[in-house]
Amino acid sequence: MNAKPGFTDYIVKDIALADFGRKEISLAETEMPGLMATREEYGPKQPLKGARIAGSLHMTIQTAVLIETLAALGADIRWVSCNIYSTQDHAAAAIAAAGIPVFAVKGETLTEYWDYTAKLFDWHGGGTPNMILDDGGDATMLVHAGYRAEQGDTAFLDKPGSEEEEIFYALVKRLLKEKPKGWFAEIAKNIKGVSEETTTGVHRLYEMANKGTLLFPAINVNDSVTKSKFDNLYGCRESLVDGIRRGTDVMLSGKVAMVAGFGDVGKGSAASLRQAGCRVMVSEVDPICALQAAMEGYEVVTMEDAAPRADIFVTATGNKDIITIEHMRAMKDRAIVCNIGHFDNEIQIASLRNLKWTNIKPQVDEIEFPDKHRIIMLSEGRLVNLGNAMGHPSFVMSASFTNQTLAQIELFANNKDSKYAKKVYVLPKTLDEKVARLHLAKIGVKLTELRKDQADYIGVKQEGPYKSDHYRY
């Protein structure tokens, strides 16, 4: 399977991998009932006809099913991965072979990563996208940073706080020189909205909304119950140990593991390690989450307590500098260190660059300290489940990506009479319950139905929604 004749608007590792990718996409479709039902329901209506979606989300087999669902609903699409290690090259090849522009290679450099992200906005024919589908907020951030600089505030471009920021700001400067005056403003004006996949990207959106700098409406897909309580929790429960095992081949049973953070991702990660036979410790700043961890039977400690005791360390906080170089100096010889939060700054990777690195295999490095003790770093502190394994299973991603599809429809087709202002919204409970319903039959669930008198008794409709908006699942 090769790309369509004359179609060259893609960058992938090897287009010859497309046949392999297509076979795996076919398998994934069977495990993604929500997306397939969405195609069947909305396909004839073409609600995304005219949508030009700039997508920045891990270019996996499951994402390929999402991309082709959006295309089946009428959208025109350009796509990049949101992480330098998360691309599955056969998935990217299959999408390119289908004639959809995609720019994603597993192991791309940071410079390549940001160059590819910029390609999202170089629409064929000289137009711009009118929708963003984001994971982590990098595509959204590029538009906002460029717009800010166009408005005359350029001082921040000379104050990078990391290697990646230096590369990112250099890209913004280059685009300001190369593109027509007001290019970023034109993009911002044309964007009808963004749907954001993950906790970290949502934080960025709320920060901008609170400051009044958000340039277009946003839907927070992450906080849909059928995303955060399934993808973040059950997805991590399956994929974390998969990444650690593929990366290291260590026996997990009997090991001491430390999980930093006990939100939904941390809960899933701790459960993953416990089910593998680890003795699990947890650190938390939130007293509620700390109490939850203790009530689940985990030992709640600080990272300082855990550093010399644990064999495996996992960060899952969405915050920075969770594991510092001081913590790593105190670790056992060949302790395993990894991250399952969105960005790599949860671990102080930059502070290790002047030490001796020995690459064991792709995304597995041994780092030696001056005292000769070593640690094993997975995926250079980036997402371990996608860098060292294949990410979450298709079924749980179907729920997340069905939410993404509904959010894109909502922002593009249903934003009548300025229904959505430049704020952050969540999908209504009715759609959350709909997404859940679409996945029940696949796993043999028989749902009990309320009688009218029962529904009246608890003050809900027979068809739902069954919980208030503030209900905590």
Curated annotation (Swiss-Prot):
Any one GO CC term of the record: cytosol
Cofactor notes: Binds 1 NAD(+) per subunit.
Primary subcellular site in the record, as a coarse category: cytoplasm
InterPro entries for the chain: Adenosylhomocyst_ase-like_sf, Adenosylhomocysteinase-like, Ado_hCys_hydrolase_NAD-bd, NAD(P)-bd_dom_sf, S-Ado-L-homoCys_hydrolase_CS
Cofactor(s) required, per the database record: NAD(+)
Location(s), subcellular: Cytoplasm
KW Cell membrane (keyword) present: no
Swiss-Prot/TrEMBL catalytic activity: S-adenosyl-L-homocysteine + H2O = L-homocysteine + adenosine
GO MF: adenosylhomocysteinase activity
Listed pathway(s): Amino-acid biosynthesis; L-homocysteine biosynthesis; L-homocysteine from S-adenosyl-L-homocysteine: step 1/1
Class of enzymatic activity (EC top level): hydrolase
EC number annotated for this UniProt entry: 3.13.2.1
Keyword field: Cytoplasm, Hydrolase, NAD, One-carbon metabolism
GO biological process, one term: one-carbon metabolic process
Residues annotated as signal peptide: none
Keyword Transferase: no
Domain remark text: Each protomer consists of two large domains, the substrate-binding domain and the cofactor-binding domain, which are separated by a deep crevice forming the substrate-access channel to the active site, and a small C-terminal oligomerization domain.
Subunit structure: Homotetramer; dimer of dimers.
Record-stated family: Belongs to the adenosylhomocysteinase family.
Listed name of the protein: Adenosylhomocysteinase
Organism, scientific name: Bradyrhizobium elkanii
Source lineage: Bacteria, Pseudomonadati, Pseudomonadota, Alphaproteobacteria, Hyphomicrobiales
